[in-house]
Amino acid sequence: APAESRPALRMVPEMKDLAQKLLERGFDVWAFSLSGQHAALEAAKLYGLHPTRVVGLRNKILNGALTAETLNPVPEGYGQAEAVALLIGRNPVLAVGKPQDAALLDTDDGDGLRVLLAAKDGPDAAAARAKGWVVQPPFSPVRDPQQPDAPNAP
């Protein structure tokens, strides 16, 4: 019998709702991911994001072959902030990220809203609040068809 597999891409309903509301109100919504560019593009479809607004890890192509060399900016740490400056040209009005995205969240000239996805009483929460960031507990992704797994039927 063939092996069953689950979809590797998971969507976070609250983030999709936020992205959709921002898009409906005319905001330019971008996604930065350390996932490969192709996987990031597929995931962005779940959120309704335009493919030109998705930045994933990109590898150099040499003589038609994919190499192990990554292209800058690498969308992680300070590379995220570099990508924002390079591709958007200004600090974001809203940035949402995890503790490892602190460099991106720090790209604030005082006018933007920053949301850290972390435990409210976790080690990063106090530092985030001291910077004026909102601390939001992380959301749980759900699997296709975008509903929590049902308990096993007897």
Where are these regions (language model features)?
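C-terminal cap/substrate-recognition subdomain and adjoining C-terminal extension
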Residues: 1-154
